[in-house]
Amino acid sequence: MRLILDTVTFIWAVSAPERLSRAAASALLKSTTVREVSVVSLVEIAVKQARCKLTFSKADVTAGVEDLQLRVLPYSARHAFHLFDLPTHHADPFDRQIIAQALAEDLAVVTPDNAFYLYKGLKVVW
């Protein structure tokens, strides 16, 4: 199974793993799971950290990627073109980009955000 963590899931997995659901934690621990985080999440964390809305540091991100053995998924034009076809179930531009990536790459998204379930064809783990 290939999984992509949304931003809050990545942060929780690193700093507060007890906040993960059992299904999410189990999926992340499976040795056969390919775990990914979007470069979009790294941008979102950097933006929020710069605006003092988050205390998650660059070192936290780097350590989290290493500790969780995550592949950082680049964002491509192919991903961006998926945005044109997405309904607007919610307006968060970072989430929408992660959804577009997940659909383009056939990834399941690990997220506590119920709005993700509204996107047809999107696989969600929580």
Q: Where in this protein do the model-derived segments appear?
A:
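Short, well-structured N-terminal submotif of metal-dependent ribonuclease cores
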Residues: M1-V37, R51-A63, D67, E105, ...
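Active-site neighborhoods of divalent-metal-dependent phosphate/nucleic-acid chemistry enzymes
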Residues: K53, S57-K58, D67-N114, V125
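Phosphate/NTP-binding elements of NTP-utilizing enzymes
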Residues: I45
